[in-house]
Amino acid sequence: HVRSRRQRQMCIRDRRVSDPCYERDVWCCGTVDHCKLGTWEAGVLKTDEGEWGTRCAVLAVRHKDTGPDFNVIRLGKVRKVACKCVEQSFEVGVDSGQAGFFDDAFYQNDTVFEELPAPGFAIGDLWYRHVCDITLSKMSAGVLPYGAVSSSGFGDGGYTCYTHADENGVIDFAFIVFI
């Protein structure tokens, strides 16, 4: 089933797609350029993987006014949607069991969390600790200021990001397929 949450305003047109543990210049992450400005929403498709339990199969973000509905990522439809979307040229590498979409201007920026309560996770800088609190929560996914993140399916590996553009060529929907 798909669960969604609202995300904050997007300030710039570039979205970093990455494991939050990576620095900007690592080879296995990338940016999606020319994203629509405004409020974005995030949704995660969780699937029952038998002995592995319930896992995050797909993390998606959409512009709240124009992006495709989250129903398109439901099990069985995600591959069909991928054919209508553009596969991005970068690999979404994962080494910390999580990946997400982040406003590139605020990626790894501790100041977005300065006014919030301290995170429970104790390793890394303030930004990374807050991100880990989200993926270590019961839902294994959620939103943060200027981003969305989820656990990555079965964990570490390389994954694919797809994007959808509106009639003007502006990105209004993107997703990472983990399973």
What are these regions (language model features)?
Residues 58, 62-126, 134:
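Surface-exposed beta-loop interaction hotspot
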